[in-house]
Amino acid sequence: MSETQDMIRDVQDYPSRLNDPKSKRFETFSYLPQMSAEEIRKQIEYIVSKGWNPAIEHCEPENAILHYWYMWKLPMFGETDVDKIIAEIEACKRSNPNHLIKLIGYDNIRQTQGTAMLVYRPAQ
């Protein structure tokens, strides 16, 4: 074996809180307590007021850091009805009850995400 292979073999992955999916943080507001339904509604209203296009993504908690998230349908281009956006979040929850769910506001003027936030974390 080469010296590099010996060093790699000796590296150990020690368990830590980073191995616990419940301890991981994702996107804006992730270090705050879980938002209430009314607080999520206000964030959606903000996204709509900025003219951003909402989109929903979901992913298994254990894959959320190192993998791409799944897009729920297509981004909701031009959608301004907050209740329709909430209904899509709820539909995603029903179809993927064990997944994390993220709401994104795409800013098509700046060609970037205006915001992204976790709106659902499954009970573990």
Swiss-Prot record:
SMART domains: RuBisCO_small (SM00961). InterPro entries: RuBisCO_ssu (IPR024681), RuBisCO_ssu_dom (IPR000894), RuBisCO_ssu_sf (IPR036385). Keywords: Calvin cycle, Carbon dioxide fixation. GO terms for biological process: reductive pentose-phosphate cycle. It comes from the Bacteria. The keyword Repressor does not apply. One of its GO terms (molecular function) is ribulose-bisphosphate carboxylase activity. Pfam families: RuBisCO_small. RuBisCO catalyzes two reactions: the carboxylation of D-ribulose 1,5-bisphosphate, the primary event in carbon dioxide fixation, as well as the oxidative fragmentation of the pentose substrate. Both reactions occur simultaneously and in competition at the same active site. Although the small subunit is not catalytic it is essential for maximal activity. The basic functional RuBisCO is composed of a large chain homodimer in a 'head-to-tail' conformation. In form I RuBisCO this homodimer is arranged in a barrel-like tetramer with the small subunits forming a tetrameric 'cap' on each end of the 'barrel'. HAMAP family: RuBisCO_S_bact. Belongs to the RuBisCO small chain family. Heterohexadecamer of 8 large and 8 small subunits. PANTHER family: RIBULOSE BISPHOSPHATE CARBOXYLASE SMALL CHAIN 1, CHLOROPLASTIC (PTHR31262). This is Ribulose bisphosphate carboxylase small subunit. It comes from Hydrogenophilus thermoluteolus.
